[in-house]
Design a protein with these regions (language model features):
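A short N-terminal helical cap/helix-turn-helix that marks the beginning
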Residues: 2-24, 42
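Conserved pre-ATP/AMP-binding loop-to-beta segment of ANL
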Residues: 20-22, 137, 155-180, 187, ...
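Conserved AMP-binding/adenylate-forming core of the ANL superfamily
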Residues: 24-71, 76-78, 95-100, 148-155, ...
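Conserved AMP-binding A3 loop
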Residues: 34-38, 176-202
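Conserved structural elements of the adenylate-forming
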Residues: 41-46, 172, 191-211
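Short beta-strand->loop structural element characteristic of the AMP-binding/adenylate-forming
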Residues: 63-65, 73-77, 81-117, 190-192, ...
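ANL superfamily adenylate-forming
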Residues: 117-172, 278-313
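Conserved AMP-binding/adenylation subdomain of ANL enzymes
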Residues: 199-220, 224-312
């Protein structure tokens, strides 16, 4: 069994232990498209081969900016990390000035963006980032380079040995990513995290998993440029959970109905909004329906996860 010490070990562990048909699932043109554990690894290796042919070196920085979570982001993540380079995820909603600052501060050589709006913002400051060689898009946009060009460049497997050498030279203590703060108190701050930093978080979270390994389904919608959701995605991979990526925050309720996930991560404010909406709707009910709803709410308030609330709860 694979010993997980680097972030790119997670997909290989998943393939060896679970090999699920829907490791990563994204909706395209109204259809949920699945990428299996094996396809995930194969495409990540294709990206790694392409990046090496593009002269990416150990400790180079590659920025990835996406307005929503998607399969392509995860493939790029593993493909980048396997070369010994670092993935620099950036919030899609920040200003052009912050893009300029982060891309310069990190020294990003390439940038991958999701859509036309993000591309427009990056192009506005592109000439002010001397290190930036090229910008690629995930969506097909006229006149823009597309990430599929890397999939084509990496098709030739003749340099796969170079990928394996790069992987073998990545140590747990090596830098894996630089995650920038949102910049609400000044310039964004770059947080440097090693492979071990994140791997240890994933492995230590195993005692809290609320799902069945190998058979569960997750819905992912929190921004993966934040360390919480990113760590959770590796945790899902570790436990063979099929990850469905939500289309947008506005479509979460629709996606939940479609996907019927066993688990998803959320933040308190979102849960408060859902609770308030349910509660407000409940106050409009009458009779037995109202009694049943508020009985269920009261029961939920008494739920004690992991026995963590103490004897007086």
């Amino acid at each position: 069994m694979i010993n997980i010490t680097r972030l790119f070990d997670f997909p290989y562990y998943q393939q060896e232990k679970f090999n699920i048909p829907g490791a990563l699932v994204t909706k395209h043109n109204g259809v949920w498209e699945k990428t299996s554990s094996t396809e995930y690894i194969n495409k990540a290796n294709t990206i790694s081969r392409a990046l090496i042919r593009m002269n990416i070196q150990k400790d180079d920085k590659i920025a990835v900016i996406s307005t929503n979570n998607r399969t392509e982001w995860n493939i790029m993540d593993i493909g980048i990390l396997q070369t010994g380079a670092q993935n620099v995820p950036i919030y899609p909603t920040i200003s052009e000035d912050d893009y300029e600052y982060i891309l310069n501060h990190s020294g990003a050589i390439y940038c991958f963006v999701s859509d036309e709006e993000v591309l427009r913002k990056v192009n506005l400051i592109r000439d002010k980032v001397p290190s930036l060689k090229e910008v690629y898009t995930f969506n097909t946009i006229e006149g823009a380079k597309n990430w599929t060009e890397l999939l084509e460049l990496g098709k030739d497997q003749s340099n796969q040995d170079s990928v394996e050498d790069r992987k073998n030279n990545v140590k747990p203590e090596d830098l894996a990513t630089i995650i920038y703060t949102s910049g609400t108190t000044g310039k964004p701050k770059g947080v440097m995290l090693s492979h071990h930093n994140i791997v240890s978080d994933v492995l230590s979270s195993s005692s809290r998993i609320p799902f069945e390994p190998g058979t569960s389904v997750a819905l992912s919608f929190l921004p993966v440029c934040h360390i919480f959701e990113r760590m959770i995605l590796y945790l899902y991979q570790y436990y063979g959970v099929s990850i469905y990526f939500g289309e947008s925050i506005d479509k979460i309720s629709d996606n939940i109905k479609e996907v019927k996930p066993n688990v998803m991560s959320a933040v308190p404010r979102l849960l408060e909004k859902v609770y308030d909406k349910i509660y407000a709707k409940g106050t409009e009910l009458t009779g037995i329906k109202k009694s049943l709803l508020f009985c269920a709410i009261d029961l939920g308030l008494k739920y004690e996860p992991y026995g963590a609330n103490g004897a007086w709860y």
